[in-house]
């Protein structure tokens, strides 16, 4: 449960957004008025951005309460920042055998609810502040012998009660690899094989697979029905030396990942940003 994760983040010395388990309209309104709008509501026991909403007024909250059904929801104050992760395969002592992480520039909640294009990328190297937060979280949760995908907020501005710009907050833990095509992106990003590393962890409690040079690995998902300036052929020609995956996204994943995906590998952030710009341009 998302609410149960909060105490373990506290053990790791990481703040989290203020939260409340929604019971009725009156208590939900009290919490929203205490922290201020917008607030975010999501199932306390759920995956990804399914049934996750940003509420900006009493009217939004009343509409949500009228339609939420019997599911238990957690309500949190809205955090002004972006999501960065610490992903790893850890051994029986909780020590990483492989490390990576991604940045999601836009909220997955907004991508799903507003039907936006989908973007995220694997960083070339995990920043020390995220690595430190990740390792402390691993210790607090007592994680051993598994793949992990730990999510953190990085504040994009000072926020009263939470911290200063650049501070790291706990968001959610996932005792699994990141979803979608990310496991393959790990391999492209570090010229390795995380499937082999995971098997080595299970069988030998160590890694026997070398890890190569590090790169940025960028995902871009386009939506059907949008008229983009560059078509599929033009993208494939322009980025032939960089694109490592492309194709249709299964409909079951299209809410968060869009319909047509391109994954590119780059040595510099500037190259990656140019790739994003070219794929995003539309009429």
Q: What is each model feature region?
A:
Residues 68-72, 78-120, 127-169, 174-182, ...:
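Phosphate-binding core of ATP-grasp and ATP-grasp-like enzymes
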Residues 51-52, 182-185:
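A short secondary-structure junction signal
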Residues 48-49, 81-83, 214, 256:
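Short acidic/glycine-enriched loop/turn segments that link adjacent beta-strands
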Residues 197-283:
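Peripheral (often C-terminal) accessory segments that flank ATP-dependent C-N-forming ligase machineries
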Residues 43-45, 111-112, 253-257:
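Short, flexible turn/loop "capping" segments at secondary-structure junctions
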Residues 1-81, 91-96, 118-132, 277-281:
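Active-site nucleotide/adenylate-binding loops and adjacent lid/helix of ATP-dependent enzymes
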Residues 184-200:
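Gly/Ser/Thr-rich active-site loops/lids in small-molecule metabolic enzymes
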Residues 14, 141-143, 239-241:
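Short secondary-structure junctions
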